[in-house]
Structures are given as C-alpha cells and as structure tokens.
C-alpha cells in the first residue's frame, strides 16, 4: 500500500498501422468511425515511413475501406506505457487488489462526497480505493465508508473518511431543488430522488401535507413548491436545522411549518388539530410501528378531524408473501383492520430485501361501520 497510485505505470500492447502522412487524416477518420482507434493514449505518432496510427488491442483485421486507401497496410503490435491518467479506475485498483476480489465500481454521490459500502475483505484496501475514486472523478473531494449499520434514532451514519478532505457539508441538486446538509449528521439517500418525485406527484395542490419523519426536507420542499401547505417534522435536531435552511434556499419557508419533536406526538397533534390531507412517514426501518398513533388519532377524532391518506415506507422480504406480511404488520400497529392498502415496490435494498411504499386512507378504516356519525370532510 506504499505505492502512490500516481506513480503506477503499465505497459500495454496495442495494434497499429503505418500510413503515408498525406493519408493520415482519411484513414484515421475511417478507424474512428468504426471505433477502432485507441482512446487511452495518443493515437497518431511519428514513424520513419510516415505516421503510425494506434488501434485498440482487440483489432484482428483491417477494414476494407482502409486497405483500399493503403493496400500495403498491416497490423503491427505497438507497446505503450500508460500512466494513471490513461489507466481506468479498475486497472489502477487491480494493481493493488488481487483476483478474485471484486473491485467496487458503484458509489453514491452526495455533492462532492462519494459514499460506499465495502465488504470486510476489501477493508485492507480502503485507502487506495478512496484515492483512486478521487483520481478518476475530479468532482469528488471526500470519500467515506459507513462504519456498521444505521441503528440510532436519528438515522445518521457513523462515517469514516478514507480519502480526501474531512468535509461533510455539501449540496445536492435534484429535480430543480437544492438540498444542503451535513451528511455525517443527517439521513440522505440520493437513490430516492424518483420516489420523492413520485409521492409528491400524488398530492393535490392546496392540500395539507404532514411529513412526520421529514429528514432535511426532500418531500416537504417539493410539496411546498407544488402549492401544498406543509407541516414537516423530524426528531433529529440537525435534520431540523437543515430542513429550515433548505426551505429558505428553495423559497418555500412561508408554506412550511417546521417541527422538532417525536413523530408519534406530532401525528397525534395533527388529528387533535383538525386532521390533514396526507401523512407521510418515510422511515422504512420503523415507520410501520408509528401507525399506532394514526389508529389512536383517527378513532379519537373521527367526528371532528379530516381523515388523511397515509403513505409510509417499510422493508420486507420480497421472496415471501410481502403483501400479507405488510398488511399484518400495519393492522397490528393500527389496532384496526385495513379494508384496502396499495403496495408499491420502490427499490431493491439488498438480496431478498426490498423497500415498499404503502398507502391507505384513514376514511376506509371506518368503511364497514355504520355512518350515523360521519367524520368531518373538508
């Protein structure tokens, strides 16, 4: 691990042909069109007999168009010494990481931060992996890995910087919005951009949206920009801070009331204060457990509060009967039967584990009861 990736050089054998100087341009154009010209290195060099055009190593025969112009042309091996600038990310890392270990090729980008999860067998190579990510991705200034699972109440990760500067204050631009955060102190997942857009697309303009576990505001800011009135809450004081900042940055502060309290208390207050049109709970690990507050609030305030549409996210095993599993868990927490619940598969989290979006209407909870005491509808 003592070798700086910038010091690495590799000798690689390419194919080449020699052509008369005056035919260099036309022949090179043919080869480029057919994607046969080398791209890792300078593809035209001087030669005593004219110009040598460097081709990719995989070429086994020349196109007939080239032979028509230069009948005497023939393929010749041509060794080239490649530096780190010309080597690919995988070629650089393979200098350090032996077969059959798999080189990590994907990571989440959060502004200038690259975040990735490394299996145990790659941890000895974490520093050089980080350095190579920065070398081959100029926009990345910080590379971090997660240390253990997310198991604290605030959902933020314990991060280790493996390369670059220790700077977690960053900005992300999504769907025309800007979200600023301290990535080390809040929860953020760039892969949920489409889900944020999809959920907010279901909201009606001028509706009242209550986001009980809002994080730094990906749902709240979008909903407010759409014209909804939003009450956004998160228990994490750092998320609360960045929520307010992001409302200012995106010009929606007037449409968003921000809260920093327990989600159950927040939900109960919404029912006690007349209800709302939507309740969102984007905490897949435990959101289903908070349905008890919705069940209590709906029963207690059935006559006086609007009955919202509830949208919550949850993990489950897709290989089993996830519909029955999600429904059973939801009904247990609610303390009520669910006549209907829409379930949408959001994304694959890990082998066999999926994130689902579950949607139901609180009004449907009372569908089988008599209507002598209808709940308030506005």
UniProtKB/Swiss-Prot annotation:
E.C. code: 2.1.1.228
Pfam family, one: TRM5-TYW2_MTfase
Catalytic function, reaction form: guanosine(37) in tRNA + S-adenosyl-L-methionine = N(1)-methylguanosine(37) in tRNA + S-adenosyl-L-homocysteine + H(+)
Subcellular location: Mitochondrion matrix; Nucleus; Cytoplasm
Entry superkingdom: Eukaryota
GO BP term, pick one: tRNA N1-guanine methylation
Positions that bind S-adenosyl-L-methionine: 196, 234-235, 262-263, 282
GO molecular function, one term: tRNA (guanine(37)-N1)-methyltransferase activity
Keywords: Cytoplasm, Methyltransferase, Mitochondrion, Nucleus, S-adenosyl-L-methionine, Transferase, tRNA processing
CDD domains: AdoMet_MTases (cd02440)
Keyword Glycoprotein: no
InterPro entries linked: MeTrfase_TRM5/TYW2, SAM-dependent_MTases_sf, TRM5-TYW2-like_MTfase, TRM5/TYW2-like_N, tRNA_Gua_MeTrfase_euk
Entry-linked HAMAP family: TRM5
Cited function: Specifically methylates the N1 position of guanosine-37 in various cytoplasmic and mitochondrial tRNAs. Methylation is not dependent on the nature of the nucleoside 5' of the target nucleoside. This is the first step in the biosynthesis of wybutosine (yW), a modified base adjacent to the anticodon of tRNAs and required for accurate decoding.
Family to which this protein belongs: Belongs to the class I-like SAM-binding methyltransferase superfamily. TRM5/TYW2 family.
Summary of subunit composition and partner proteins: Monomer.
Protein name: tRNA (guanine(37)-N(1))-methyltransferase
Species of the source: Trichomonas vaginalis (strain ATCC PRA-98 / G3)
Lineage: Eukaryota, Metamonada, Parabasalia, Trichomonadida, Trichomonadidae
